[in-house]
């Protein structure tokens, strides 16, 4: 995950702009981590998922809605077709936020999506006016909105409690434009400058691993060839 964390440094115009310390929200199919980064290799985990990673929840919710893999881009695309925005999904682990409860939980959102869609399908057997495709779009929007809202509030609390005014968001989920737009609004609200990798560097790639390795080498660190 260090490669994802440092991916924005691959951008020429950002390499000198991003200074330590900063916060990092790493969101992928396998991980969801909120980290305080003091220097290369000096990381403090402030919060993490206690069940499904965010990207995993996107994939599973997409499967529930009959969408192909990978689910993240499919959910984002379908959510743009939402018109009524009538569903409100829960925001897990938001109690005691002011006491720095910065962990995440997304398995319940997936289950909520499943139960909501199952109920709609049952109703559609009786009410032929129900547009299942539109209902899927409404669910996709509500799910995406809930995940993003949790990220926003947790990162805001982390910034306020640490006094850090820079945030990197990286990993596959960071390619979501809805998420980026919402964090741009947060930047104006609390002056939290947010950085992202280019879209081509959001998913796993060799460039970010090479950069992370180079930074370790510059620090004089070496790894045995057999590891």
PLM feature segments, named:
Residues 77-167, 176-190, 217:
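A contiguous, well-structured pocket-lining segment that forms one wall/lid of small-molecule binding clefts
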Residues 1-22, 212:
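Conserved phosphate-binding catalytic cores of ATP/NTP-utilizing and phosphoryl-transfer enzymes
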Residues 166-167, 184-209:
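Conserved phosphate-binding/catalytic loops in two-lobed NTP-binding clefts
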Residues 4-6, 197-227:
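Glycine-rich phosphate-binding/hydrolytic loop that grips phosphoryl groups
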Residues 6, 24-26, 32-36:
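Short beta-strand scaffold segments in enzyme catalytic cores
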Residues 2, 38-83, 109-119:
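Glycine-rich phosphate-binding loop plus the immediately following alpha-helix
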Residues 28-30, 167-176:
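Glycine-rich beta-strand-to-loop/alpha-helix junction loops that act as flexible
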């Amino acid at each position: 995950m260090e490669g994802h964390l440092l991916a924005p440094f691959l951008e020429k115009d950002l390499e000198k702009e991003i200074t330590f310390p900063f916060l990092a929200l790493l969101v992928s199919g396998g991980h969801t981590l909120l980290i305080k980064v003091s220097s290369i290799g000096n990381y403090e985990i402030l919060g993490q998922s206690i069940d499904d990673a965010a990207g995993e929840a996107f994939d599973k919710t997409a499967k529930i809605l009959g969408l192909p893999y990978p689910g993240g881009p499919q959910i984002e695309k379908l959510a743009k077709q939402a018109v009524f925005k009538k569903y409100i999904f829960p925001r897990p682990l938001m109690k005691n936020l002011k006491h720095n409860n910065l962990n995440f939980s997304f398995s319940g959102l997936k289950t909520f999506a499943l139960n909501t869609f199952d109920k709609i399908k049952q109703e559609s057997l009786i009410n032929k006016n129900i547009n299942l495709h539109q209902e899927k779009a409404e669910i996709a929007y509500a799910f995406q909105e809930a995940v993003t809202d949790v990220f926003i509030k947790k990162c805001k609390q982390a910034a306020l409690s640490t006094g850090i005014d820079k945030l990197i968001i990286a990993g596959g989920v960071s390619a979501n434009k809805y998420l980026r737009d919402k964090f741009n609004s947060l930047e104006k609200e609390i002056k939290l400058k947010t950085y992202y990798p280019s879209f081509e560097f959001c998913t796993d790639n060799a460039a970010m691993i090479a950069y992370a390795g180079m930074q370790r080498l510059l620090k004089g660190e070496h790894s045995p060839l057999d590891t």
